Amino acid sequence: MPAARVGSAVVTGHACDAATTIAGPGATTVLIEGVPAARLGDLTTPHLAGIPPICSMHTMPIIGPGCPTVIVQGQPISKVGDNVDAGTITSGATTVLVCGS
C-alpha cells in the first residue's frame, strides 16, 4: 500500500467534517516525496466531530495496524487503509509502497 505522510487525506467517519489530513508530527528524519513519513500515533489536523448541529473540534491518532516491518523513529510506518479513530487513511505516496504492496 502507498505510505502515508504528513498531509495525507483521511476520511473521518464523522458527520460534521467528512475529511481531514494527517498533521503529524511525522518522522522528520524520514521524508517521503519531501514530506515527513506518518507513523502510528501521529495525529490528524483538528476537525469537527459529532452529529450536526452538535459538533466539537478534536484530533484523532493513527491507530493502525501500520506496517510492522517498517519502523520509523521507533513506530510502524502508516499506510493507506490504516485506521484513524472512526476513519481511514485514503491517500499516500504512490512512489513508496510498504507492507508488500
Segment roles from a protein language model:
Residues 1-101:
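Intrinsically disordered, low-complexity proline/glycine-rich segments
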